[in-house]
Amino acid sequence: MTSTLHSTSFNTTRSKQVFARAQSLMPGGVSSPVRAFKSVGGDPVVFDRVSGAYAWDVDGNQYIDYIGSWGPAIVGHAHPEVIEALRRALEKGTSFGAPCVLENELAERVIEAVPSVEMVRFVNSGTEACMAVLRLMRAYTGREKVIKFEGCYHGHADMFLVKAGSGVATLGLPDSPGVPKAATSATLTAPYNDLEAVKALFEQHPDSIAGVILEPVVGNAGFIPPQPGFLEGLRDLTQKYGALLVFDEVMTGFRISYGGVQAKFGVIPDLTTLGKVIGGGLPVGAYGGRREIMEMVAPAGPMYQAGTLSGNPLAMTAGIQTLDILRRPGTYEYLERITEKLATGLLQIARETGHEMCGGYLPGMFGFFFTAGPVRNYEEAKTSDLQKFARFHRGMLERGVYLAPSQFEAGFTSLAHTEADVEKTLAAAREVLSTL
């Protein structure tokens, strides 16, 4: 790969044609809003194939990819061991609709790794996992109200589309048309990292809050880590008021550490949602937690939840192989080293080129904002210079670096990214930032 790809040679003719056709076939031309490049301008590039740390579009342009299918590709795209395992699984069938041994094998790995999980249920997406865990919180406690945090995204279910992040933040929507007031009337919101606001909600509703759900490290409003004591404070508050604490680790699970945020920070929730990495690039989700809570889920208990393709052999196979790769010695040390080099390099170059920028990283996950910061919550994230981010994104794209097309999304590194990839990325960033 050449060190940079300049705009004079950046041809996206075929991508434009494909996207133009897509807009007559699908709403906005995409299957998920952020892919349409609405917040950064211009037409999206249309991918043709991916391998390792790289993606190629239909015009033949090559990119260093820092989205990684929005998180699942932590071992790199199309990892040979994952592809071979899937090839063998395909020969046995794509979906059984019946129990299979692969479910046991992935469940055992999840339970072994994630401190809060004593039992697990597989579903087909992170949204589905969060929908089910919300129902379970209410079923177990007999209470209805739930606290979520502004800018935290837990999927597109009605009850979570209140001050949500991810695509909702990208489009600047406070919620979504079509969501009845009744669906969100029991959803309480607080600023992320604001323990006093959560205390106030519990004081106002001491006996009616089923639990608190959050991204323990926010990735759907940009990268925002928890302040010291915040997660611990939530654990104490929920225990004090008899409520449940739920970590949405769809993004962070098996990424920032093998056991997720809860293992790295030492704060153990009652329930956890998972997705992305545990499917190795195939559609998957899961929720799990304490045995006494999970035994409420049908058919063991009265709380109903089901899915035609849940636990399908292909997703289970890809997940098993991906987790086995991640368990190898040195994995997360490498992810931390490569992510640190990228994230600290971007901040240094921004300073040297005269731009206000703040940001941070954890192994395999990073983010930055065009503001002096600090950014501790969604409101502070919105102070970022979105026009500058859009110009930066375009400049990087033209130079062969694919970043998330939204200021309000985290970036991801993988085991396939090399120091040379990071150096090329930083060289491109210096070139772009010098012109903004």
From Swiss-Prot:
Keywords: Chlorophyll biosynthesis, Cytoplasm, Isomerase, Porphyrin biosynthesis, Pyridoxal phosphate
CDD domains: OAT_like
GO molecular function: glutamate-1-semialdehyde 2,1-aminomutase activity; pyridoxal phosphate binding; transaminase activity
Catalyzed reaction equations: (S)-4-amino-5-oxopentanoate = 5-aminolevulinate
Pathway participation: Porphyrin-containing compound metabolism; protoporphyrin-IX biosynthesis; 5-aminolevulinate from L-glutamyl-tRNA(Glu): step 2/2; Porphyrin-containing compound metabolism; chlorophyll biosynthesis
Cofactor or coenzyme needed: pyridoxal 5'-phosphate
Coiled-coil ranges from the UniProt annotation: none
GO terms for biological process, alphabetical: chlorophyll biosynthetic process; protoporphyrinogen IX biosynthetic process
Pfam annotation, one family: Aminotran_3
Top-level taxon of origin: Bacteria
Assigned protein family: Belongs to the class-III pyridoxal-phosphate-dependent aminotransferase family. HemL subfamily.
Protein name: Glutamate-1-semialdehyde 2,1-aminomutase
Organism whose genome encodes this protein: Synechococcus sp. (strain JA-2-3B'a(2-13)) (Cyanobacteria bacterium Yellowstone B-Prime)
